[in-house]
Amino acid sequence: MPLNDFHVSEPYTLGIELEMQVINPPGYDLSQDSSTLIDAVKPQLTAGEIKHDITESMLEMATGVCRDIDQVAAQLSAMQHVILQAASEHHLGICGGGTHPFQKWQRQEVCDNERYQRTLENFGYLIQQATVFGQHVHVGCANGDDAIYLLHGLSHFVPHFIALSAASPYMQGSDTRFACARLNIFSAFPDNGPMPWVSNWQEFAGLFRRLSYTAMIDSIKDLHWDIRPSPDFGTVEVRVMDTPLTLDQAINMAGLIQATAHWLLTERPFKPQEQDYLLYKFNRFQACRYGLEGMLTDVYTGDRRRLADDTLRLLDNVTPSARKVGADSAIDALRLQVKKGGNEAQYMREFIADGGSLIGLVQKHCEIWAGQ
């Protein structure tokens, strides 16, 4: 299938997707009934979209095109209210977090959707194991070449985005010792990690054509890179963040990515080259394993520095851009988070260390999402 032309969109506009957990109290395992909830919610929506994701325990909230994080907040808040009301009526819970801490992948039912069923046929049990929950942020671009530059620029900060949003320390009833275990689930997929190197949109079109020869790629949606261009939307989509426990954190991460995109496209601080990616997976691993305490290695100098310190440097660099796009409150909140030295994975471990159970942890996450 040929690649569609890159749709022109207003630069720096946002679109947010949140993959939410549908929970079945009182045991607080994942429910297998998201279809009922989605059917109940759809007629009540005034903005955005609620839809299926891979399995019946997942629900995706997606905003429309938003100018700034205030519009993102308004749309997500409205959807959250409608979903929580419907969930209560159906005796279900909703929560964030990148993984459910004790669900068993063998129990997960793939949605009755042609695309997901085809994916199940291609990837087998890997699709059931991919019952994990992420936040995706789309940023508008004026053209395909800008999108490729932006993708390469944002790739420098994949570890920072992972470390700030890490919220998946528990899987299958065990502490994984990772801050973000969710991304490990995708390591067996052939398109895991960074996009193969291209320098412009024309080269990307050639890459896509070659990938389509595998008969596993029908559209850009079948590629699960950490960051990917989305020509139909005219965006670059960042896909490495865990779904947070609160809307505030989701909005803050969106604001950071918007501000970083503005800084990258206006200042052009990097000249992308293929060597930039030589240590990409090592630095990504550090962020997944240790969060903000991970160590970044500079691919050119060999210098090593704490992710927390480099994240503060990133926040300082993008602060002027954040003011221009209306995301300065997000940068301030994330700066405070880094200085306090934590992320949501750390909070989860503290809950368990204080005597809480994994069931109690999911219950607490539902209460947090409901604002209780």
UniProtKB/Swiss-Prot annotation:
GO biological process: modified amino acid biosynthetic process
Organism domain of life: Bacteria
Entry keywords, A to Z: ATP-binding, Ligase, Nucleotide-binding
Entry's EC annotation: 6.3.2.2
Top EC class for this record: ligase
Presence of the UniProt keyword RNA-binding in the record: no
Catalysed reaction equations from the record: L-cysteine + L-glutamate + ATP = gamma-L-glutamyl-L-cysteine + ADP + phosphate + H(+)
UniProt-recorded Gene Ontology molecular function terms: ATP binding; glutamate-cysteine ligase activity
Disulphide connectivity of cysteines: none
Assembly and binders: Homodimer.
Entry function: ATP-dependent carboxylate-amine ligase which exhibits weak glutamate--cysteine ligase activity.
Family statement drawn from the similarity comment of this UniProt entry: Belongs to the glutamate--cysteine ligase type 2 family. YbdK subfamily.
Protein name per its UniProtKB record: Putative glutamate--cysteine ligase 2
Organism: Salmonella arizonae (strain ATCC BAA-731 / CDC346-86 / RSK2980)
